[in-house]
Swiss-Prot record:
Keywords, sorted A to Z: DNA damage, DNA recombination, DNA repair, DNA-binding
GO molecular function: double-stranded DNA binding
Keyword DNA-binding part of the UniProt annotation: yes
One family name in Pfam for this protein: Ku
Domain Ku: residue ranges: 10-194
Record-linked SMART domains: Ku78 (SM00559)
Name of the protein: Non-homologous end joining protein Ku
Protein encoded by which gene: ku
Cross-referenced PANTHER family: NON-HOMOLOGOUS END JOINING PROTEIN KU
Disulphide-bonded residues: none
Length: 270
């Protein structure tokens, strides 16, 4: 597995060397954009339409923040790099511990497996056992890929998992959704609620993750495989016309050579 982050996790005076690995393998099917005529991948050039149609070199591109319409402040790469280093330490500290059910699932973002570095296996296992016994989550700050995250550390099967969580200001207010109904405007009858609850009970089953697959992705994969197979058949057949054309060309060349030779013989005979 590819290491996403490497450093130390501090629990009081105890330091645990850890590595983070992505827990999710997003095997999305990606398409390329090709030119219809020559099947060459489309390329996009960077240019400034108000200045030039020529492609702008990377050395002439700067980062900027738009603080008002068409008003920008330029961000120096050295300033950004220094700021990033100051807030991206290679050690993280558990801020506090919280109850396992205190965080709403909407706050969870990305998941990472936590593995110990050599020599820190026992400390790693100690933290895992303590979290399991207390049914708690460890709350931390961590910087991953140039962004600082709030995150939790919890037990997961045979190891530990780190899950980044959104900051409160990143979650939109559901009251901004238009036409949200309320009991005052749409009173629910007791028998309606009873029927809905009975239906939920009837359709309730244990969650078996292996029963659920990405049906669209499976169908798309099958379509792609069929197209590859069809193209392979076409490519295996396509050389035949070339061979026939070559044979015809060679035969025609032979006939022309015969004619030229016959004409030459006739001239010499005269």
């Amino acid at each position: 597995m590819h290491t996403v982050w490497k450093g130390a996790l501090s629990l009081g005076l105890l330091n645990i060397g850890i590595k983070l690995y992505s827990a999710v393998d997003e095997n999305d099917i990606k398409f390329l954009s090709l030119h219809k005529e020559c099947l060459t991948p489309i390329k996009y050039k960077k240019f400034a339409p108000d200045c030039t149609d020529e492609e702008v070199d990377d050395k002439d591109i700067v980062k900027a923040y738009e603080y008002a319409p068409h008003k920008y402040i330029i961000m120096d790469e050295k300033e950004l790099s220094a700021l990033q280093k100051a807030h991206e330490p290679r050690s993280i500290r558990i801020i506090s511990f919280i109850q396992n059910n205190e965080i709403d699932s909407v706050l969870y973002d990305r998941s990472y497996f936590i593995g110990p570095t050599p020599g820190h296996e026992k400390s790693y296992l100690l933290l895992k056992e303590a979290l399991e016994r207390t049914n708690k989550l460890g709350l931390i700050h961590i910087s991953i890929r140039k962004k600082q995250h709030l995150a939790i550390i919890r037990n997961f099967e045979d190891g530990l998992m780190l899950q980044t969580i959104h900051y409160p200001n990143e979650i939109r207010d559901i009251t901004n959704i238009p036409n949200l109904p309320s009991n005052e405007n749409y009173p629910i009858q007791k028998q309606e609620l009873t029927a809905a609850i009975n239906l939920i009970h009837h359709l309730t089953n244990p969650f078996e993750q292996e029963l659920y697959t990405d049906e669209y992705k499976e169908a798309l994969t099958e379509l792609i495989e069929n197209k590859i197979e069809e193209q392979a058949k076409t490519e295996s057949i396509s050389p035949a016309p070339n061979i026939i054309n070559i044979m015809e060309t060679l035969q025609a060349s032979i006939e022309q050579a015969k004619i030229k030779r016959d004409n030459k013989t006739e001239k010499e005979a005269k």
